[in-house]
């Protein structure tokens, strides 16, 4: 568990690390006003995706409802717009559950992360394969930095224009192909 004080009156961020083998983290949820879930399966494989992208997020949602949490913010992914893979379907299933939960929510769908793309560039430099489709325009994206995404997520707490919405977000520059 890690606490961060933003220097704002009555505002504190508590990061809770979730463990599959230890449920003591559940007890730490009782005083939370806003849930921000950045959970995502590591492999994206069907079993992993169901357990994390749907079931674990759903457990958090049920806890949020039980303690009458004010808001639930979900970090999702832009790729769920045209789902083909198991993790995309699991994310969409949870998004639907969240939208119908009765809680105030924001669903954030970033286009891509600079960190992820830079890792792909390093792999290409090492001679590893990279697959793109057609002329590359189908996979173009406008990546966002971790800092910019974090600030956007936090802005969803107080910006009522971002409540009860699905919010695609990209970086400040032109799309990369």
Regions picked out by a protein language model, each given a short descriptive name:
Residues 39, 77, 169-171:
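Short glycine-centered, acidic/aromatic-flanked micro-motifs in structured strand/loop junctions
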Residues 2-67, 79-81:
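NAD(P)H-binding glycine-rich loop region in Rossmannoid oxidoreductase-like domains
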Residues 41, 48, 76-77, 110, ...:
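Proline- and acidic/polar-enriched loop/turn elements at helix boundaries
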Residues 34, 70, 104:
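Residue-level detector of anion-binding/catalytic polar loops
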Residues 70-76:
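Short beta-strand segments at enzyme active-site cores
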Residues 1-3, 22-24, 67, 81-177:
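Oxidoreductase cofactor-interface core, primarily capturing Rossmann-like NAD(P)-dependent enzymes
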């Amino acid at each position: 568990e890690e606490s961060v004080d933003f220097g704002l009156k009555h505002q504190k961020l508590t990061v809770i690390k979730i463990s599959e083998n230890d449920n003591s983290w559940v007890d730490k949820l009782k005083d939370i006003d806003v849930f921000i879930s950045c959970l995502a399966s590591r492999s994206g494989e069907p079993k992993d995706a169901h357990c994390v992208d749907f079931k674990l997020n759903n457990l958090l949602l049920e806890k949020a409802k039980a303690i009458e949490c004010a808001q639930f913010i979900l970090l999702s992914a832009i790729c769920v717009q045209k789902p083909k893979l198991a993790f995309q379907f699991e994310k969409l299933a949870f998004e639907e559950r969240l939208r119908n939960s009765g809680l105030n929510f924001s669903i954030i769908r970033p286009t891509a992360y600079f960190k992820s793309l830079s890792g792909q560039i390093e792999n290409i430099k090492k001679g590893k394969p990279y697959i793109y489709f057609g002329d590359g325009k189908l996979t173009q994206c406008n990546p966002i930095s971790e800092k910019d995404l974090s600030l956007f997520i936090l802005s969803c707490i107080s910006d009522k224009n971002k409540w009860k919405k699905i919010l695609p977000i990209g970086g400040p520059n032109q799309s990369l192909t």
